[in-house]
């Protein structure tokens, strides 16, 4: 949801019939879109979802809404960030995602429905043999993306001529991926740390989370607390 915020997942009692859904991997499209557009990836046959990041004053700071096809392609994706007063609304149309209002081509796709290019900023993406986006570059910035064996995003590193911004996320549980800690550095100096724990549904997707972010770029460091609310519907 934010560059330093990747979100969700803590206590689930599983039954034997839940295991196939719980172990479903993260699709290349879900993992790659969540890495690039700062929301939390979900696994399994997701039909639609809403993720809200709520601050300790009870205000919704960011909200992401998505609808997916049965093949796992995003049909619509909406993102709003109230602190920065920014909003993005995308709709799938053949090999592009269009601005839902202006119908301008925002994202070019490759393969089934994977990121290929952001024409407006000149960002071009590269995928690996598993179809996950692993690199992105413009004329001034290059970014590498990392995932675990199940496709869960482990962070990304962006480099310019004079700076390197990197986030490394480490899940604390091999199954409950959204219980994690992360460290973000700028030119090898820690600027924030985060820790998250969540409640999970039967697909091992987060239903709610508590996120604590420590801003280490100021003295003394400042702790920010958030809750994350998820509404998820499945096929």
Annotate each PLM feature.
Residues 17-235:
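Buried hydrophobic residues that stabilize the cores of well-folded domains
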Residues 1-15:
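Sec-dependent bacterial lipoprotein signal peptides
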């Amino acid at each position: 949801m934010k560059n330093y915020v990747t979100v969700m997942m803590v206590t689930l009692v599983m039954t034997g019939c839940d295991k196939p859904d719980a172990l479903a991997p993260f699709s290349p499209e879900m993992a790659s879109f969540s890495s690039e557009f700062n929301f939390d990836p979900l696994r399994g046959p997701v039909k639609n979802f809403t993720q809200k990041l709520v601050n300790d004053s009870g205000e919704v700071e960011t909200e992401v809404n998505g609808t997916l096809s049965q093949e796992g392609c995003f049909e619509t994706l909406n993102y709003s960030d109230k602190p920065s007063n920014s909003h993005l609304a995308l709709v799938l149309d053949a090999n592009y995602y269009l601005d839902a209002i202006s119908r301008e081509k925002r994202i070019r796709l490759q393969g089934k429905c994977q990121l290929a290019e952001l024409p407006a900023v000149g960002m071009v993406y590269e995928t690996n043999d598993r179809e996950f986006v692993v690199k992105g570059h413009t004329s001034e910035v290059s970014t590498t993306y990392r995932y675990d064996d199940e496709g869960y995003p482990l962070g990304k590193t962006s480099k310019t001529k004079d700076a390197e911004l990197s986030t490394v996320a480490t899940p604390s549980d091999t199954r409950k991926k959204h219980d994690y800690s992360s460290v973000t550095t700028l030119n090898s100096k820690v600027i924030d740390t985060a820790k998250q724990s969540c409640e999970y549904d039967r697909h091992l997707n987060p239903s709610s989370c508590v996120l604590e972010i420590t801003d280490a770029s100021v003295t003394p460091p400042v702790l920010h607390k958030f809750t994350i609310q998820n509404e998820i519907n499945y096929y």
